């Protein structure tokens, strides 16, 4: 029996190699290299994304190149994960040096890198402790678990009665917990039953927030300082300050989801810094590794963090030496190259120029730093605009039908910014 299985396996591998060779030989006849990339993904991959039709093979700084060799401005930055620019040499060097030494230990043992990283990141952001994870959604899950545990141990909420409040149109991932907090049908339909104890209120509505916090079973309010996936929705001035005041007043933890807005993207190290307030729990991700490796972090003070005991939460990869070394290098780049300051300056330039575009095509321009969006009037199609931008050498993606997010890497200089603005203007005027 095993001999037959082995023979089948060899035959399958030989068949695969033959097919691969035949495929390579017929590349020219089958179509462009990009089309072959699309076809392979479509055949063998899950259909859970709708990517722009461009097949990328290289990135450097603010630019990416497709498999045909065409260069583009990257105005998505992997949803703000590549703040430091593609393949930043300092981050690449940190990755390769650590990868050749020690990549993973799990948390079953100590490593000589994790403590160094923990000290660095807690001092930088002003918290007692950090719990290292890998992805942004893991950070959100971690924050929710911390908040619930704190609610039971410290606030004395009755068992299994803790509630977490979220803002409508939030987005923090695709896990069951994350979609349980969503009011977007494309995120939650067909995936119930949902996580209990999650409630939604309007974003940027102080009265609604205060009313919800009066419930003694509420342990936390989790909110993005600027709603990214919703279309770069910037709250009113003073909103975050009121969030801080109300959460303190009602003994509720404020969880700031800075996975997309944090790490210099909005022109400050953190978006909450605009109002000089500190959340009880801070979630970081994406650019924490400069797009080089999945790294996320949840930071808070001892009163909250020490509610979690050994064995109650963790991750095999969370806090691994490779991720820690990469994250420290990525954070150093933000500071050494003054990328928050550059994002602030370049963002002002971008919004000022975008505001001159014809109002019959672009009805709204909004954002902070280099997290920006335009709203396309309904008689035009945002997807079609993005296709034309691609043809003209700039990559961006629509969100929610009529909104296009503009978020280039923070290393962009003024010459590059003006060149990319010219592409946007040319494209919009052609509509």
Curated annotation (Swiss-Prot):
The Swiss-Prot or TrEMBL record describes its family as follows: Belongs to the class-III pyridoxal-phosphate-dependent aminotransferase family.
Q: Write one Pfam family the protein is assigned to.
A: Aminotran_3
Protein's name in the database: Ornithine aminotransferase, mitochondrial
What InterPro entries does the database record attribute to this sequence? Answer: Aminotrans_3, Aminotrans_3_PPA_site, Class-III_PLP-dep_AT, Orn_aminotrans, PyrdxlP-dep_Trfase, PyrdxlP-dep_Trfase_major, PyrdxlP-dep_Trfase_small
- What keywords tag this UniProt record? Aminotransferase, Mitochondrion, Pyridoxal phosphate, Transferase, Transit peptide
Q: In which pathway does it act?
A: Amino-acid biosynthesis; L-proline biosynthesis; L-glutamate 5-semialdehyde from L-ornithine: step 1/1
Catalytic activity, as annotated: a 2-oxocarboxylate + L-ornithine = L-glutamate 5-semialdehyde + an L-alpha-amino acid
EC number(s) from the headed UniProt entry? 2.6.1.13
Question: What are the coiled-coil residue ranges?
Answer: none
What is the protein's quaternary organization? Homotetramer.
Do you know which NCBIfam families this protein is assigned to?
Answer: Orn_aminotrans (TIGR01885)
């Amino acid at each position: 029996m095993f001999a037959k299985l082995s023979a089948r396996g060899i035959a399958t591998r030989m068949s695969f190699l033959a097919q691969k060779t035949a495929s390579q030989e017929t590349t020219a006849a089958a179509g462009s290299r990009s089309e072959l990339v699309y076809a392979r993904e479509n055949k063998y991959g899950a259909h859970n994304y709708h990517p722009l039709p461009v097949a990328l093979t290289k990135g450097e700084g603010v630019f990416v190149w497709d498999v045909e060799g065409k260069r583009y401005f990257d105005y998505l930055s992997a949803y703000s994960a590549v703040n430091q620019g593609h393949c930043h040499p300092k981050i690449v060097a940190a990755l390769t040096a650590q990868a050749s030494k020690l990549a993973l230990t799990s948390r079953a043992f100590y490593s000589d890198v994790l403590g160094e990283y923990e000290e660095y990141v807690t001092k930088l952001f002003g918290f007692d402790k950090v719990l290292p994870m890998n992805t942004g959604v893991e950070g959100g899950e971690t924050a929710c678990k911390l908040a619930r545990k704190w609610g039971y141990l410290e606030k004395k909420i009755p068992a299994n009665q803790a509630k977490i409040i979220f803002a409508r149109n939030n987005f923090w991932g695709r896990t069951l917990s994350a979609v349980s907090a969503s009011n977007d049908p494309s995120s939650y339909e067909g995936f119930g039953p949902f996580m209990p104890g999650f409630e939604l209120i309007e974003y940027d509505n102080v009265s609604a927030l205060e009313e919800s916090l009066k419930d003694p079973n509420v342990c936390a309010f989790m909110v993005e300082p600027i709603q990214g996936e919703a279309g770069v929705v910037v709250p009113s001035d003073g909103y975050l300050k009121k969030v801080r005041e109300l959460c303190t007043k009602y003994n509720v933890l404020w969880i700031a989801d800075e996975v997309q807005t944090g790490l210099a993207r909005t022109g400050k190290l953190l978006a909450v810094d605009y109002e000089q307030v500190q959340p009880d729990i801070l979630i970081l991700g994406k650019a924490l590794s400069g797009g080089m490796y999945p790294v996320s972090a949840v930071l808070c003070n001892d009163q909250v963090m020490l509610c979690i005991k050994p064995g109650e939460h963790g991750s095999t990869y969370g806090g691994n030496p490779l991720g820690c070394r990469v994250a420290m290098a990525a954070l150093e780049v933000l500071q050494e190259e003054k990328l928050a300051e550059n994002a602030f300056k370049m963002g002002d330039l971008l919004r000022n120029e975008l505001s001159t575009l014809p109002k019959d095509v672009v009805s709204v321009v909004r954002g902070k730093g280099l997290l920006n969006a335009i709203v396309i009037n309904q008689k035009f199609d945002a997807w079609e605009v993005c296709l034309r931008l691609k043809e003209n050498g700039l990559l961006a993606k629509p969100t929610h039908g009529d909104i296009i997010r503009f978020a280039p890497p923070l290393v962009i200089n003024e010459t590059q910014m003006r060149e990319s603005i010219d592409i946007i203007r040319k494209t919009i005027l052609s509509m």
